[in-house]
């Protein structure tokens, strides 16, 4: 029992450290606002969710964001957003995958998780995160919209920012995370399951 707990802690630590490092390998995606950067730090959390269970995936999300919050200048808002959206993705995929651990169900679970993540990210940004950035960081909404419009002319207000920025960005992110996880999961799962 004690050995199993220790092994789980080591695995979560390794996956969290990997996720934290992957947060720094981010890049801008054309047609999306500059503050939306794609990184693959949710892949280790998704792998944990599939191999060890959905709550382990959420733990990886939590640990990577706590570490990142200590060295960032987003006032913690970016990390709360990253944790919320990433956790929704990995938990949804993991909980569905647990019912039937096949490649087909992994694909289904990641497709559903991508849609859930995109909708949830849209709602959270509209009602929580964008207003928080305004209030805590002092970013005027006009500046956020202006920066977004520079990347995509269809973005003219908060609703179009969600429709042409936040939602499609998270769909793209979910697809990319899913593809990478499909490529590496089979190789990593034996190590993580035992």
Language-model features: where?
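Loop-helix junctions at membrane interfaces
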Residues: 1-194
């Amino acid at each position: 029992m004690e050995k199993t707990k220790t092994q789980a802690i080591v695995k979560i630590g390794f996956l969290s450290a990997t996720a934290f490092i992957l947060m720094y390998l981010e890049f801008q995606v054309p047609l999306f606002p500059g503050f939306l950067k794609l990184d693959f730090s949710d892949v280790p959390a998704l792998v944990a969710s599939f191999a060890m269970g959905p709550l382990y995936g959420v733990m990886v999300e939590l640990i990577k964001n706590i570490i990142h919050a200590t060295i960032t200048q987003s006032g913690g808002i970016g990390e709360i957003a990253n944790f919320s959206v990433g956790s929704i993705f990995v938990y949804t995929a993991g909980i569905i995958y647990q019912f039937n651990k096949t490649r087909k169900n992994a694909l289904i679970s990641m497709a559903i998780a991508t849609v859930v993540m995109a909708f949830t990210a849209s709602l959270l940004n509209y009602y929580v995160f964008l207003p928080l950035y305004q209030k805590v960081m002092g970013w005027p909404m006009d500046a956020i919209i202006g920066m977004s419009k520079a990347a995509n002319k269809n973005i003219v207000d908060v609703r179009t920012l969600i429709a042409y920025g936040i939602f499609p960005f998270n769909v793209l992110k979910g697809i990319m995370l899913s593809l990478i996880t499909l490529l590496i999961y089979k190789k990593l799962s034996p190590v993580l399951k035992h």
